[in-house]
Amino acid sequence: MNTNDAIKILKDNGLKYTDKRKDMLDIFVEEDKYLNAKHIQQKMDKDYPGISFDTVYRNLHLFKDLGIIESTELEGEMKFRIACTNHHHHHFICENCGDTKVIDFCPIEQIKQYLPNVTIHTHKLEVYGVCESCQKNA
């Protein structure tokens, strides 16, 4: 997803377009990895001195509710990234830097065979570890 797609979702849901929201979305698009709310606040503070953590967090949850961003828990805190919308896939997430890699393999058919008496409505697979770059820099 890019910033314009995200802004369209906001407008289609009757929400206001603001420069702050656009700039927040730009951070996600440019960095393209999982980020915590504090990182977003610090980046936003350069152009919007004194922006509150509450303002950032409210917008993050709004974006998440609209499907603009995804979230995961990493190192005991919520982290967010721009939503992937191109095709069904899963992610490898680096525990150090938050970088993600797409996993095109989906094990849902094997899981359905393993659990034949359940109804699966949805699924999300995240694999955690340390990326090559972080391993080299260790």
Curated annotation (Swiss-Prot):
One of its GO terms (biological process) is regulation of secondary metabolite biosynthetic process. Keywords: Cytoplasm, DNA-binding, Iron, Metal-binding, Repressor, Transcription, Transcription regulation, Zinc. SUPFAM superfamilies: Winged helix' DNA-binding domain. The keyword Manganese does not apply. Residues 1-85 are annotated as: DNA-binding. Its main location: cytoplasm. The keyword Repressor applies. Residues 86-138 are annotated as: Dimerization. InterPro entries: FUR, Fur_C, WH-like_DNA-bd_sf, WH_DNA-bd_sf. It comes from the Bacteria. CDD domains: Fur_like. It holds the Pfam family FUR. GO terms for molecular function: DNA-binding transcription factor activity; transcription cis-regulatory region binding; zinc ion binding. Gene3D superfamilies: 3.30.1490.190, Winged helix-like DNA-binding domain superfamily/Winged helix DNA-binding domain (1.10.10.10). GO terms for cellular component: cytoplasm. It is found in: Cytoplasm. Fe cation binds at H88, H90, E109, H123. Zn(2+) binds at C94, C97. Belongs to the Fur family. Acts as a global negative controlling element, employing Fe(2+) as a cofactor to bind the operator of the repressed genes. Homodimer. This is Ferric uptake regulation protein. It comes from Staphylococcus epidermidis. The gene is fur.
